[in-house]
């Protein structure tokens, strides 16, 4: 069956024509199952989308493991029959939440690409203008541009600076700062000139070298602009959801982390308790007891949304940087630190992260 409207509609018609109660059980396989689940749900069928990990570990009591589509279908059918009465019903996400989640997925992908492109540009500059990226400490602008990136687009080789006199470069740097809206510092101009004069470019100052640097800068600027656009769109989408004001009032949550939390958690009303939300993030510590032995050192399961754990880790970093003494989460962390817990333990301790997520 192809994923077209006509063929999926015919599939829904045939399923509805079957005698008795019909339920459709599917594995959550990326986005491949989404159009099928949505159309069958809209057709009035009972659809259940099951975590693939649950099905994978179901009924593995054979010595001979067979992996074919037919065997997987039979296994999935048996799973559905065994849990017929407890199969969770598939409910399509709201359009706003769906768009927000996909925006964040793209944002994460582009962030990885930005890191690769930034490292590539720095590596290239090591052959033409070493350490130039370390000469500037200006924060990233709202449009995603960075001062050192804009600088190397103009002064792409150390000889572009050192061939001029110190006075001539200072004047040119002044005009460049005014043109791009950056603050000018005469001391900074002297530092840049001294740095450029002390280096010898491995690659010659040529049109080919200029092309390489310009292309690297162009790619980095493009991905930075895309990230800025996605970040703004995520804020717009998140602000339309009812929990936005509550999340944004939390300590450690800024206009960037707030939409990320909302995107990863989704509709919090679908969780029956706080523990369910903790387990969804993979921060739960399963029991580890046997006989008379009661396990005391339990690590978190990490069976859950890794991207949500990453966002929570960033929120915890804000706690560590600001040390708010009146915040319960920081008080918990500080207490564990006073007990002598190692730095990495009290920073990523599951209990600390669980308290962070429960405060939401």
Regions of interest found by a model, annotated:
Residues 1-360:
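A detector of single, family-specific signature residues
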């Amino acid at each position: 069956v192809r994923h077209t409207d006509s063929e999926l509609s015919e599939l829904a018609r045939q399923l509805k024509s079957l005698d008795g109660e019909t339920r459709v059980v599917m594995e959550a396989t990326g986005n491949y199952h989404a159009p099928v689940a949505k159309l069958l749900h809209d057709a009035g069928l009972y659809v259940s989308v099951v975590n693939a990990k649950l099905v994978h570990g179901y009924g593995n009591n054979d010595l001979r493991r067979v992996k074919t589509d037919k065997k997987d279908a039979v296994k999935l059918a048996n799973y559905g029959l065994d849990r017929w009465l407890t199969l969770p019903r598939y409910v399509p996400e709201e359009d706003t939440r769906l768009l927000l989640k996909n925006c964040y997925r793209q944002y994460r992908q582009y962030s990885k690409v930005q890191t690769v492109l930034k490292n590539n540009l720095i590596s290239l500059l090591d052959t033409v203008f070493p350490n130039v990226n370390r000469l500037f400490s200006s924060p990233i602008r709202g449009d995603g541009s960075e001062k050192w990136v804009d600088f190397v687009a103009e002064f792409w080789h150390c000889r572009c600076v050192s061939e001029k006199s110190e006075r001539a470069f200072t004047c040119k740097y002044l005009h460049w700062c005014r043109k791009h809206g950056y603050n000018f510092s005469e001391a900074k101009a002297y530092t840049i000139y001294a740095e450029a004069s002390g280096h010898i470019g491995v690659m010659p100052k040529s049109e080919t070298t200029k092309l390489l640097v310009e292309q690297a800068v162009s790619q980095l600027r493009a991905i930075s602009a895309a990230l800025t656009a996605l970040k703004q769109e995520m804020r717009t989408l998140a602000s339309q959801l009812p929990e936005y004001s509550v999340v944004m009032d939390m300590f450690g949550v800024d206009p960037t982390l707030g939409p990320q939390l909302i995107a990863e958690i989704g509709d919090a009303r679908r969780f029956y308790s706080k523990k369910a939300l903790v387990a969804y993030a993979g921060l739960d510590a399963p029991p580890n007891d046997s006989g008379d032995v009661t396990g005391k050192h339990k690590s978190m399961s990490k069976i859950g949304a890794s991207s949500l754990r990453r966002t929570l880790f960033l929120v915890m970093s804000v706690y560590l940087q600001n040390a708010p003494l009146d915040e319960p989460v920081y008080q918990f962390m500080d207490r564990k630190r006073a007990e002598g817990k190692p730095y990495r333990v009290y920073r990523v301790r599951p209990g600390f992260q669980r308290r962070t997520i429960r405060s939401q």
